A protein has these predicted regions:
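Active-site acidic short loop of glycosyltransferases
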Residues: 2, 27, 51, 73-76, ...
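Cell-envelope/extracellular polymer assembly enzymes that use nucleotide-activated donors
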Residues: 4-6
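Short, well-formed alpha-helical segments that are part of the catalytic scaffolds
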Residues: 8-27
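A conserved acidic beta->alpha catalytic loop
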Residues: 15, 24, 35-44, 58, ...
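Acidic helix N-cap motif at the loop->helix transition within catalytic regions
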Residues: 16-19, 40-49, 90-91
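Short, structured coil segments at secondary-structure junctions
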Residues: 27, 48-50, 128, 153
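Conserved donor nucleotide-binding strand/loop of the catalytic core
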Residues: 43-72
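Catalytic-site signature of metal-activated, phosphate-bearing donor transferases
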Residues: 63-70, 77, 81, 88-167
């Protein structure tokens, strides 16, 4: 596919949502799945979209697991997703434009949906999260939970158009 983008997912027992997620990023050059020991159909579903599936049953926490997964990626750009998130078409188009430009960390507006309703209160909307970034210049911190992308000094951060849908 030649767009220099690696999409990364860390998973465990995500059979209910992972196919929708993978369909939404099937246009990416590379999809990397790092699984933490799923006992459901997660891995069989993932095999329909990528051969880059790795297993790490030890659980060092979200930050370290994301770092581990990033080590398997081979492209210049990383899009880090959860197994219950999908890329909207406008976001896809924005990503494809962004990765043609200079190195920058991009913040994506994530909308969270619960029981069929977009959550627009309690700080959940807008929910700008850093998920698109140059693979060689940054990574996630070591946090067990609520991990954050490390922003190098002088690195530009920009907002990108389109929505990341979290169900």
């Amino acid at each position: 596919m030649g767009n220099n983008l690696s999409v990364i997912l860390i998973t465990k027992n995500a059979e209910r949502t992972i196919e929708t997620t993978l369909k939404s990023v099937s246009w990416a050059s590379e999809i990397v799945v790092l699984d933490s020991g799923s006992t459901d159909n997660t891995l069989n579903i993932a095999k329909n979209y990528t051969s880059k599936i790795f297993i790490s049953e030890s659980w060092p926490g979200f930050g370290v697991q994301r770092q581990h997964a990033q080590n398997y990626a081979t492209n210049d750009w990383i899009l880090m997703l959860d197994a219950d998130e999908q890329i909207s078409e406008p976001l896809k188009n924005s990503i494809l434009q962004a990765i043609k430009g200079p190195d920058c960390i991009y913040e994506i507006n994530r909308i969270s949906i619960a029981f069929g309703t977009v959550i627009k209160h309690s700080g959940w909307f807008p929910d700008w999260i850093m998920r698109l970034y140059p693979s060689k210049l940054t990574k996630y911190d070591d946090a067990l939970v609520h991990e954050k992308l490390i922003v190098p000094d002088g690195m530009a951060c920009k907002k990108i158009e389109g929505l990341l849908i979290h169900e």
